[in-house]
């Protein structure tokens, strides 16, 4: 058994990223709802190198872990490629119409009021913005073990 905290997040991020192959829209601003050890941002930055990111999560330790995984190289800071992080509940209002894409990798798993989260996400997306999220379903365990 591995002690990799982000193994399931990484697996789901990779699966969701593969689905982006059919999307023709190139987002310029991506909001990450729920830190996942930088797995999602890394994949999205490779696919959309010109996109700007902002990351939201209510857990400061998860934000710290994502920032640590990114590293803070001098070159990335000079190129203004840092990722602003915001420690807040996912149901709290996000900046209005601020994103072309909102991405959440298991961000809903710990939320008690998903309706409020979806309302916040809807407000943050621009018209015709893209919402991608992963979540556990009825058959998740069967799919992950096969």
Sequence positions of predicted segments:
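Class I SAM-dependent methyltransferase Rossmann-like catalytic core
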Residues: 1-27
């Amino acid at each position: 058994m591995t002690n990799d905290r982000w193994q399931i997040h990484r697996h789901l991020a990779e699966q969701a990223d593969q689905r982006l192959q059919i999307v023709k829209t190139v987002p310029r601003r991506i909001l990450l709802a729920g830190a996942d050890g930088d797995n999602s941002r890394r994949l999205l930055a490779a696919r959309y190198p010109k996109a700007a990111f902002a990351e939201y999560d209510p857990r400061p330790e998860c934000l710290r872990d994502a920032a640590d995984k990114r590293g803070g190289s001098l070159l990335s800071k000079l190129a203004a490629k840092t990722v602003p992080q915001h420690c807040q509940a996912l149901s709290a209002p996000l900046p209005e119409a601020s994103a072309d894409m909102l991405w959440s990798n298991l961000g809903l798993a710990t939320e008690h009021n998903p309706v409020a989260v979806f309302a916040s996400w809807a407000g943050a997306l621009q018209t015709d913005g893209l919402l991608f999220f992963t979540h556990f379903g009825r058959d998740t365990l069967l799919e992950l073990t096969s």
